[in-house]
Each structure stands twice: as C-alpha cells, then as structure tokens.
Design a protein with these regions (language model features):
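A general secondary-structure signal for short beta-strands and their flanking turns/coil
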Residues: 1-3, 16, 428, 600, ...
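Accessory, non-ATPase domains that flank or precede helicase/AAA+ motor cores in DNA-metabolism machines
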Residues: 1-363, 375-391, 672-675, 698-700, ...
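AMP-binding (ANL) adenylation modules
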Residues: 40-43, 261, 637-639, 686-688
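A general secondary-structure junction signal
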Residues: 52-54, 104, 184-186, 435-437, ...
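Generic structural motif
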Residues: 118, 180, 396, 462, ...
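Inter-lobe coupling/hinge segments of SF2-like helicase ATPases
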Residues: 199-205, 209, 213, 223-659, ...
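Short conserved micro-motifs at the rims of enzyme active sites and ligand-binding pockets
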Residues: 660, 690, 709-710
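A carboxyl-terminal module marker
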Residues: 667, 671-690
C-alpha cells in the first residue's frame, strides 16, 4: 500500500500542511508527484497537489481517506519546482499552496492545435490514371483530390475543405486503398511569426570579449558563483548575453533570460530570434493561455532551448537548465507585489543552486543589494565602462526649477529644455519627454526653495491624506497639514499635479507642426499597444514621444538626441527608503536613451533639488560615488542591504480590529531578540482599498533567520486567537 502527501488547494494558514491519503491500486501506475488530484476533505470534495509518495503511513490507516481521482486537465508540477516552492514558502512567508501556484505559470492543459497533412503514396503517373478512372465513374471529389496530389504530392488537409470541397470520408477511402496517407501533428502557437534565423554575430569589442570569456571560463571550471555585469547604458551587455547563450546552447544546455516586461519589446526579442532562430520562445502577460501553454510544453519537450520573459519565465520547466540571465536586474518589477512576495533575483539564485546553473545579472545601475554582494565577494563583478560603437555619453544638464519660478516661468517646461527641443527638432532629430509618476503618493514640496516635508524619524517624505494631515507610512508619525513652507515661508507649497495627458496637450500647443506620441498605461492597454507606438516612433512617424517610465527602459532609437526628465523629485521624495536609488536609476536610464547613434545626445533633468546626490551623480554618470553615499545612508538608518527588512501587513474590513491586532502583534514581538529593531505600527501608504483597512509594522535585523522566527511567532499567535483569524489577514514582505 502506498500513501500520497497532498497540499490542499486552499490558501489558509491553518491548512498549510501535508495531508496523507491512501492511493487506490488503480491509480498507482499513473500517479506521479506534482499531479493535481481529487480528494475528500471534511464533508466536501476538494483538489490538491501531490508533493510526496511514500510507503509509510503517518496516522492510523483506519482514519485515512483515499484519493478519489486524478485531474486529467491539470499540468503536473516538476519535482524540482516543488522543492523551489517549499523554499519560497519558507523564505518569503506564504502558504505552500500559494507557492505551488506561483511555480506553475501554466496551471491547466490547453487543447492542442492539430494539423493534418495528406501525402501521395503512389507515383504522379499512377495518380493521374486513378484520377481519370474516378472521373469516369463519377467520383468527382476523388478525381479532384488525385489531380491536385499529382501536381503537389503533399498538401494541407485544410485545402481539401476550403478550396476543393472534399470531406474526410473521401480522403479516408483513398487512404484505405493505400493511395494516400493522412498524418496528424501538433502545431505549437508561436508568438513570433515568419522569423528567419540570420545567425549574424556582432564582433565583440575588447571589453565585451573579456567579460564573456571570463564568465565562460568560470562555467568551464564549474565556478557557479553569480556574476554581475555593471555596464553603462549602450555598452552592449546584450551582445555579451548572446555570446554566453551560444556557448551554453552548443554544449546542450538550456537558458532562461529574464527581461522586465516593460522592456520586452519586439525590437529586443528579435535580436535573440535572429541569432538563434526557432529554439527561442517568449512569454509575456498579454499572451493567450494557449500561447503560454505551448511555450512551456515546447520547453519541456526540448523543442525550444531559450526562454525570454518577465519574472514568471523563471519557472520554465527546462530539463537541462544551465544559465539564467537577469537583464536590468535593478528593476523593481522583479519583486512581486502579490503573495508570495518573492524576488526573481534571489529565487533565480536558489533555483541555480538546485540545477547547477550559472546566474548572470546585468545593469547600468545595479541594485544596491547586488553591488553590495559584489563588494562583499558573494558575486563576481565585471564592468563595461565604455559605450559600444562610436556613441559617446550624452551631455546631462540639471535645471533648477526654483530659479525658473523666480524668473517668472510657471510652466512645466524650463527655458533650457524649450531651447534644446527647438534646436533638435529643427534638425529633424527626435525628442523623448519623461514624466516619472511611479510611486507618487502626494508628497509636499516647496516650489520656491525645494524643501520637502519629511518624517523626523525615518528620513522619508510625509504623505498628505484626505483629511489634510501628513503621515509617515513607516512609523505612523502624524502632523497637521501645512500651507506655508517652514523653510522659507513661501506659499508655493503643494503637490505636483501633472500627468502625461496634460504634458501632451501643452507640447502640442507649443510645437503644433510636430507629430507627438504618448506612451502610458492608457495608450498601451491593448495587446500590441507598446509595439505599435515604439515601432511608429522608430520609423520616425513622430518627432516627440511623451511617457512614463516605460519609454526609458532599454529602447534603442538612434535618432533620439534629447531626453527631458520633467520632474526628478517625484520619485526622489516618494515615501520609500529606496527613493534615492530609484531616482538615480531612472535618471541614468532616461539620459541613456539620448545619443545612442552617431549623433551627440543631450539630457535635461528638471528638479527642485539640484544639489541632491542622486541627481548630481546620475548626471555625471558616476555610479560609484552614488553607491558610496547611498550605502552610508542605509548603514546609518539600518536599511537593506545592510539590514534585512520584514514588513508585516495587517488587513481587515473592521478598522478597529486592524488597529487592535497591530498593537497586539507589536506587544508580542517587543519581547523578541533585542537585536531586532521594530518600527510602527502605522497606516499603510494606501490605507483603505475596497473597504479593507491596512496597517503595517516594520522589523529590521542583521539576521534573516531572526525575522523568520518572528513570523513563526505571529503565525502561532494567530492560530491561537480565532477572534482575529476569522476577521484579519496577515501578509509578509521580506527584503
């Protein structure tokens, strides 16, 4: 007798354990670990995932129930992915059921597309004779089919029904006589059509060749320590990736290449397809279920060897995974906003340990975590310090918006930006205007002196709430709203109010003879929205492209010679300890879009804080100086990567219960290790969503395990207090 360990398909902490069931004899030949099964659970029928098969019962067999069926339509989870799901559950704080669903980007089988083909088994002359005989006997359908096959010995079955008006019965009659053969094969849905592999290789320059050869040497020697490529914008990191991929493919390995969805453009993907042809596949959020299913089926069967996609591509079921590349590794999109709140970089490193694969990270602006790890010797560091080809660095200028206001300019466009736009457009060159509204939650800043109202305890900006009060979303500190700047006494203090539509409207008035495109969440809602706008801009169907951060992510437009960042402060003073890092990244990436061809590029950075180190160093293309200042701030405030960080989020439709439970958890964990620092509880940045209230508590510690211990303590408390368990939900976020 054998027994199955099953995780029930219910994401609840109390049910987050393995339940054992008897495997009926009839199921034994078919059942595998990773299958979805039907089970009796309590008084109902449920489904669950088999994570273990054993000979030993854990409870009395007389009390054990039997599996009732296998869900034939579900996808089987690879055993390695079950192991990874268990790591995700423990490391990021989720249920096993949530983690299992995460590692299954495709959860159900999708009907295959089948293609029938008819093959002529006799000679052309015999076919012509059979056709004449069929015509004499008035078998006109057979005659038409044989005449067609005499000219073309292999035809698609669809031709019979669409053009020749022949049914399957007629074809079957000829097949039974041994005249033709009907074959059927599965067609995979391919998201890239009509691609011809050129195999064209770009010769690497000296820097690129050194980096590629060094990483290849590491792989040859079995050195699988993660490698970080710090390469300035336009330095040709992709060429290095392609060289590494080719080396792995030639040795029988498979490759996952993660690219943030916002950068996953047709232009980017085609560079891989042109080099490697149809062994490449791509996934993204706008693909159909069928396309996603086929991509993963092709990976499992070995029909494709390279998978490109956002963080969900990490769970591609390759059999010989040898290399994981994470491009633009600094991107916040690699961190999931949903439970489990995993980070693709950390998860990739864990997956690589399980499979013996190499992880290669790349960025012009590495995340502080990755650079910190490189400095500590946990990652190998390689640098590309020069732009590939003839392109030089763009000239970046900082414009002080306080001076613009004093000089009577109350618009959102500085005089210098207007001057350069007129100059570039007159030369038929293109312009990109970037408005960073990501993370914008209503900080207050003075337009006269640039002062931003910040928390005296946490060094993050205070957020204005509907009641007019200013709140810190880290520690809960509150203060009344203000109308006059406490620094200079000016009345010009408030929230920055501008969106891409307003910018577009104003630019069209200022440049009526130039074509303008806008790229934001509204204009890219449809499946091919991104591609159409980018293709139009690349083909110079527009002179000016306005957009949010999606326009500055990895796109290469040789005719763009000016980039304007309209207000750098929006990201700089978002209520987040990573605000300066995000600002540095965005300005560097934005400025890097200019002058990528052979023409000189310019970038104009508009700000009320021209002296801030993140802006100054970004304009000077000086990552090292920025890192040194920012890591000193993190050390002073005990923020990651120096300390580990855990956010405990308490949610409930009952506002009183949310506040009450927050205080209970704070009191409970106050008794924890004295080395753990606790901040809060306070209201979440978005306090109420769909009638659910959110509060949060922050924990900081040098050791990740101590934070895990606090999580277990909170989980145990919740299990023992049903009055909270039924009305409140706890979510964890580790950094």
């Amino acid at each position: 007798m054998k027994f199955a360990g099953v995780i029930v398909d219910i994401s609840h902490e109390q049910l987050d354990k393995i339940f054992q069931y008897i495997i009926p004899e009839t199921m034994l030949p078919e059942l595998e670990i990773g299958m979805k099964v039907q089970i009796p659970f309590g008084k109902t029928k449920r489904t669950g995932y088999v994570v273990d098969i054993s000979d030993e019962p854990e409870i009395d067999i007389s009390r054990m129930k039997s599996l009732t069926g296998i869900c034939g339509h579900s996808v089987t989870i690879d055993g390695r992915m079950i192991k990874l799901a268990n790591w995700i559950k423990n490391h990021y704080g989720s249920t096993m059921n949530q983690a299992l669903k995460l590692v299954m980007p495709v959860k159900e089988k999708v009907r295959n597309i089948e293609k029938k083909t008819i093959h002529l088994l006799i000679s052309k002359e015999e076919a012509e004779e059979y056709a004449k005989e069929a015509a004499r006997k008035r078998y006109t359908a057979r005659a038409r089919l044989l005449e067609t096959l005499a000219k073309t010995p292999v035809v698609d079955y669809s031709l019979l029904t669409q053009k020749l008006n022949i049914n399957l019965t007629t074809a079957k009659t000829l097949e039974n006589k041994g005249i033709i053969e009907i074959t059927t094969h599965t067609m995979f849905r391919n998201t890239i059509k009509n691609t011809i592999k050129s195999g064209e290789k770009i010769l690497l320059n000296e820097e690129q060749r050194y980096v590629a050869e060094s990483i290849i040497k590491d792989m040859e020697n079995g050195d699988m320590m993660p490698s970080l490529i710090k390469g300035v914008t336009g330095s040709g990191k992709t060429e290095v990736y392609l060289e590494l991929i080719e080396w792995v493919i030639n040795r029988g390995g498979d490759v996952i290449c993660l690219i943030p969805e916002i950068s996953l453009t047709y232009q980017t993907v085609m560079r891989f397809y042109n080099r490697f042809g149809d062994i490449v596949s791509v996934i993204n959020s706008k693909m159909s279920k069928g396309e996603r299913y086929d991509s993963f089926e092709m990976a499992k069967s070995g029909k494709i060897r390279i998978m490109i996609g956002p963080r969900s591509a990490l769970f591609t079921p390759f059999n010989r995974l040898s290399l994981i590349i994470i491009d633009e590794e600094h991107e916040s999109a690699y961190k999931s906003e949903n439970v489990p709140r995993y980070h693709a970089r950390e998860t990739a490193i864990e997956l690589a340990k399980m499979t013996g694969a190499k992880v290669v990270l790349g960025s012009a602006t590495p995340s502080l975590e990755s650079y910190y790890n490189a400095k500590a010797g946990r990652f190998k560091l390689y640098e590309l310090n020069n732009r590939a080809g003839l392109a030089g660095f763009p000239t970046a200028e900082i414009v002080d918006l306080r001076e613009e206001l004093r000089n009577g300019n109350r618009t959102m466009f500085s005089n210098r930006l207007m001057e350069l736009m007129k100059e570039k457009l007159s030369m038929k060159e293109q312009v990109m205007l970037f408005l960073n509204r990501r993370g914008y939650l209503g900080f207050l800043s003075c337009r006269n002196c640039g002062h931003v109202i910040t928390c005296p305890h946490c060094a993050v900006s205070l957020t204005e709430h509907g009641n007019g009060r200013l709140v810190c979303h880290y520690c809960g500190y509150e203060t009344p709203g203000i109308k006059i700047c406490p620094e200079c006494g000016s009345k010009h203090i408030g929230r920055f109010k501008a969106g891409t539509e307003l910018v577009e409207s104003e630019i069209k008035k200022l440049f009526p003879d130039n074509k303008v495109l806008r790229m934001d969440a509204d204009t890219t809602r449809n499946k091919d929205g991104h591609a159409k706008i980018l293709e139009a801009f690349e083909n110079h169907e527009a002179d000016i492209l306005i957009g949010t951060q999606m326009i500055v992510k990895g796109h290469d437009f040789p005719n763009v010679t000016l980039v304007g960042v309209l207000l750098a402060d929006v990201s700089l003073y978002s209520p987040d300890y990573m605000a300066a890092e995000r600002t540095f990244e965005l300005i560097t990436q934005a400025a890097g879009r200019a002058g990528r061809g052979n023409k000189e590029g310019n970038a104009v950075i508009q700000t009320y804080s021209p002296e801030h180190y993140s802006i100054v160093h970004a304009c000077n293309h000086d990552y090292e100086s920025f890192y040194n200042e920012e890591i000193a701030f993190r050390e002073l405030m005990d923020y990651p990567p120096v300390y580990n960080f855990m956010t405990v989020r308490i949610a409930s439709e009952d506002e009183q219960k949310t506040a009450e439970l927050s205080e209970k958890i704070k009191q409970l964990t106050d008794k924890a290790d004295s080395r753990t620092k606790i901040i809060g509880p306070g209201k979440a940045p978005v306090y109420k969503v769909k009638d659910v209230f959110f509060r949060q508590i922050y924990y900081k510690d040098k050791e990740h395990q101590r934070l895990q211990n606090i999580k277990k303590e909170i989980d145990n408390f919740m299990k023992e207090h049903s009055e909270y368990l039924s009305k409140c939900q706890i979510q964890y976020d580790f950094r």
